[in-house]
Amino acid sequence: MSEPAAIGGKEREQILDGTAALDEFVRRAGYPSIEAAVAHHTVFLDPATVTQTGGGALFPVIRNAARRGIVDVVDGREVMHCDNTTPTLAFLWAADRSNGPDIQFNHVWSRSSDPDCYTALWNLCCTPAFVAKTSDTHGTIVELLRYRSYDLYGHRPLGVAAPTPPVGYQSLEWAAMPPPATDLEQRLRLRMLSAPKARPTIAARTIGWLYSQGPDTHLR
């Protein structure tokens, strides 16, 4: 928790400016800007993979770490509460990749209580942990990632205006994408069948998921 700059009327010097430190770090590494560094290390899924979802979220899940694993009715919809396990696995399974050290899976739009966004593949990206904080707190990075997602997939949360291209966007080089899934539904089914106790599998089996009408009995 941050301490106010002035307590008892006394101004105190900031112990560290993290934004300035990151800016210096990326420039010393040879990047022209923080935006260029983040782009170079941010992985999005191939549009050919995401297109197979039709813009829908994969699983009826929302974030509530304290109630993770519990099925509930929220705003008239049956959902499962989760920490970030389900969106993380959704991204990794869709990419056909395993997790790596010191990385973070980020929501492009912070809609953790919206089941239409929380596990939507167009709303997810992966970054090294050392730049992940910028996806939440650095305004230009937030705008950059939102436009990147919209540019790739054409989706955005309901009621949100279409983002506009940031200055210099066309000159950025982005991290390579995993090869596209030939059949995303089949890929995900195979992963769930091999992980029957994983939270996405339980949600799909109990409530349903994007590719089922109600609880998916094929996952029992």
Residue ranges and their predicted role:
Residues 91-126, 130-139:
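Histidine-centered nuclease catalytic patch
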Residues 117-119, 134-174:
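Polybasic, low-complexity binding patches
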Residues 70-100:
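Short N-terminal edge-element motif at the start of the domain
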Residues 1-82, 143, 148-155, 187-217:
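Nuclease and nuclease-like effector domains acting on nucleic acids or nucleotide cofactors
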